[in-house]
Amino acid sequence: MFEYPLRPEELYAHQGLGISEDAFHQMLEDMVDKKLLSKKEGFYFSPFARHENIVRRKKGNVNALEMMPTAIKWGKRIFRFPFVRSVSLSGSLSKNYFDEHSDIDFFVVTKSGRLWICRTLLILYWKSLSLKNKKYFCTNYFIDETVLEMEEKNHFTATELSYLVPLINAAGFNNLMTHNTWVKSYINNRAPVLSYTINVQPGIVKKAIEALLQNPIGDMLDNFLLKKTIERWRRKYPELAAEDFELQFRSRKNVCKRHTKGFQNKVLQQLETLRADYETRTGVKLS
C-alpha cells in the first residue's frame, strides 16, 4: 500500500493547486532537486521508497492490460442478471494494476427497490463458481440508481469513485458521477477511462424476471433479503462494534457495501501516518 510510483500526469490529476500542467511538472522537478521527491524512468516517488517498486508497477500494469478482456467478459455476465443497470470496474484493476493477490472487483448500480434481490442472485451465482473464477467475480459494492450520492466523502471514497472504469452502460456511470461532484475537491483533473465501455440491451429472460417481480411480492422479497443478510453478517462478525459494522457492511435498502478487515480505515490511517512521517523527515508541511 502506498508503494506505487506515479507518472507526472497521474500526480497532476490529484493536485488542487489550480496551476497548469507545465508549471506542475516544473514544481515536481524542483522537489527532486531539493530531494523531497525521487525520480527514475519517468516515475516520481517518495525519497524514502524503494526503487524496486518501479519494476513491480510495470509488471502489474502489463498484467492489468492482459486481464481487461476477462474483466469485460465477467462484467457482461453480471449485467445479464435481473435489476442490474450498469457495471463498472473498481479495485486495483481499475487503477491499471493486477498481481497474484488481486481480484476483479465490480461496482454495480441496480434498479430502485430491487438491490437485494439483485445482489442475492449474484451471490448465489458466485457460490457456484470454481475457486479460480471467484476471484474474477467480486461484487463488493451495490447502489440503487435513485440514491447515488455517496455518504462517505473522504479521500478513500473519492479515489475509488474517480478511478471507476465503466464497462456496461455509460449512462448509469455518468449519472453516478453527476451525483458525486464532490469528488473534484480531492481529485479534480482526472478524466474517466471510457475506452472499455459498451452499451448492452437487457435480454428477454432478464426482462421477464424483472416484470414478474415488479409488484408488492417483489417489494416484500427485497425487504426480506435485506433483513436476512444483515442478520447473517451480525452472526458472522459479532466482535464488530456498531460503528465498525456500519462502515464495513453498510446494508440499507439502497446500498450494500461489504469490505471486511476494515480496509478503508486502514488506508486512511496509513495515509495519515505516512504524511506525518514525511513531514518529520523532510521538515515540509503537507497540510
Enumerate the language-model features and the residues they cover.
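Catalytic core of pol beta-like nucleotidyltransferases
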Residues: 1-86, 90-101, 111-287
